[in-house]
């Protein structure tokens, strides 16, 4: 029996609560008698819905309140979508566990159109992501890309009301919320490179909390960690915040020995796109991510990102 209580800081959205409940169930599975409590809270990113994410501080807005709760000992762990987690952590906190990854692809969602390629000229497509906007405009400059904020249900409601012809969401969120029937098309990484960590759930805790770390250990997925840390290393080396047109995606070979990592940096209007890829031993995943970033920088990625930051008034956090 384990009489320990673990308090999970979580946002209140349906998807965030699903992730927290998943971690709760896993902890209860591995530790008989453990007491797990959810501590739901509202983040700044949940409140400011009338401004594009990039202009109000990127996706770090969705984790800061949860981190403060841990530092003030109001919670023991925080559960995050890895694509929302900034590459650097506050002093005293760290990424302890990365859980098994769900489908990392983006999803094309429409009530009337079957796929991205079937969109009529000038169609209105909703997304809050500059990464998605960049890649959409590169392949389909005719599309009218409009900002789309809110939780999954809010975004789907806006689509159903006719505000958009289609919207792009992370497939993982729809699958987890048992809404995969809303997905008209899974967009392959070759067509739209995902965000670093997309589809993965991470668990953050205090670095000095040995008891919590021991309890979390069975939830770790080693292969997901290799992939996600390689992707995040590329993002860190590019000094890219969560809300910039950067895509990165790692795949481990069938024999488990190598990782193939792809990355891209583009302008928001899709007129410029720099892409590259690299393969090497899984043990060198983060080094490969750094190397891939240097390759992109040597080809002008830094100039594109500087322009993106200035033109879009992006706060890099």
From Swiss-Prot:
User: What more does the entry say?
Assistant: The porphobilinogen subunits are added to the dipyrromethane group.
Which reactions fall under this protein's catalytic activity? 4 porphobilinogen + H2O = hydroxymethylbilane + 4 NH4(+)
Q: Which InterPro entries match?
A: HemC, Porphobilin_deaminase_cofac_BS, Porphobilin_deaminase_N, Porphobilinogen_deaminase_C, Porphobilinogen_deaminase_C_sf
* EC number assigned by the record: 2.5.1.61
User: What assembly does the database describe for this protein?
Assistant: Monomer.
- Pfam families named in the record: Porphobil_deam, Porphobil_deamC
Biological pathway: Porphyrin-containing compound metabolism; protoporphyrin-IX biosynthesis; coproporphyrinogen-III from 5-aminolevulinate: step 2/4
Entry function: Tetrapolymerization of the monopyrrole PBG into the hydroxymethylbilane pre-uroporphyrinogen in several discrete steps.
What keywords are annotated for this sequence in UniProt? Porphyrin biosynthesis, Transferase
**GO MF annotations for this entry?**
hydroxymethylbilane synthase activity
Q: What is this protein called?
A: Porphobilinogen deaminase
Cofactor dependence is on: dipyrromethane
Top-rank lineage group of the source organism: Bacteria
What is the top EC class of this enzyme, as a single word?
transferase
Give the note describing cofactor binding and stoichiometry. Binds 1 dipyrromethane group covalently.
Instruction: Give the sites modified to S-(dipyrrolylmethanemethyl)cysteine.
Output: 242
- Its GO CC terms? cytoplasm
């Amino acid at each position: 029996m384990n009489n320990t209580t673990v308090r999970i800081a979580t946002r209140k959205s349906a998807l965030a609560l699903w992730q927290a409940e998943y971690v709760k169930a896993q902890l209860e599975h591995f530790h008989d008698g453990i007491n797990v409590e959810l501590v739901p809270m509202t983040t700044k990113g949940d409140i400011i819905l009338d401004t594009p994410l990039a202009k109000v501080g990127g996706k770090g807005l969705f984790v800061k309140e949860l981190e403060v709760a841990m530092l003030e000992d109001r919670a023991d762990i925080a559960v995050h979508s890895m694509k929302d987690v900034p590459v650097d952590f506050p002093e005293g906190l760290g990424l302890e566990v990365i859980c098994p990854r769900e489908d990392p692809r983006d999803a094309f969602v429409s009530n009337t159109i079957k796929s991205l390629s079937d969109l009529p000229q000038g169609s209105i497509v909703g997304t809050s992501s500059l990464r998605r906007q960049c890649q959409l405009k590169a392949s389909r400059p005719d599309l009218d890309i409009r900002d789309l904020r809110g939780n999954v249900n809010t975004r789907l409601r806006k689509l159903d009301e006719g505000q958009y012809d289609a919207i792009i969401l992370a497939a993982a969120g729809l699958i987890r919320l048992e809404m995969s029937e809303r997905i008209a098309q899974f967009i392959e990484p070759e067509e739209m490179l995902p965000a670093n960590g997309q589809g993965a759930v991470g668990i953050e805790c205090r670095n000095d909390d040995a008891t919590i770390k021991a309890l979390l250990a069975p939830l770790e997925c080693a292969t997901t960690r290799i992939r996600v840390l390689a992707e995040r290393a590329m993002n860190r080396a590019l000094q890219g915040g969560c809300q910039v047109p950067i895509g990165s995606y790692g795949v481990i070979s069938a024999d488990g020995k190598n990782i193939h990592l792809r990355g891209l940096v583009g302008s928001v209007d899709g007129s410029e796109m720099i892409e590259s890829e690299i393969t090497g031993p899984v043990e060198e995943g983060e080094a490969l991510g750094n190397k891939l970033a240097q390759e992109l920088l040597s080809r002008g990625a830094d100039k594109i990102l500087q322009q993106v930051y200035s033109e879009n008034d992006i706060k890099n956090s």
